[in-house]
Amino acid sequence: MRKRFFVGIFAINLLVGCQANYIRDVQGGTVAPSSSSKLTGISVQ
């Protein structure tokens, strides 16, 4: 049960990170890295 909980958190973090990257791409890459991308550990290039 505990393993499923951690997998769920990981999936949510992944979705949030991908959504932040998508929004940044749509707006031309002018958006500064948000706190959500830092929390998920996604490096912004």
UniProtKB/Swiss-Prot annotation:
<feature type="lipid moiety-binding region" description="N-palmitoyl cysteine">
    <location>
        <position position="18"/>
    </location>
</feature>
<keyword id="KW-0732">Signal</keyword>
<protein>
    <recommendedName>
        <fullName>Lysis protein for colicin E1*</fullName>
    </recommendedName>
</protein>
<keyword id="KW-0998">Cell outer membrane</keyword>
<keyword id="KW-0472">Membrane</keyword>
<feature type="lipid moiety-binding region" description="S-diacylglycerol cysteine">
    <location>
        <position position="18"/>
    </location>
</feature>
<dbReference type="InterPro" id="IPR003059">
    <property type="entry name" value="Lysis_col"/>
</dbReference>
<feature type="signal peptide">
    <location>
        <begin position="1"/>
        <end position="17"/>
    </location>
</feature>
<dbReference type="GO" id="GO:0009279">
    <property type="term" value="C:cell outer membrane"/>
</dbReference>
<dbReference type="Pfam" id="PF02402">
    <property type="entry name" value="Lysis_col"/>
</dbReference>
<keyword id="KW-0449">Lipoprotein</keyword>
<keyword id="KW-0564">Palmitate</keyword>
<comment type="function">
    <text>Lysis proteins are required for both colicin release and partial cell lysis.</text>
</comment>
<dbReference type="GO" id="GO:0019835">
    <property type="term" value="P:cytolysis"/>
</dbReference>
<keyword id="KW-0614">Plasmid</keyword>
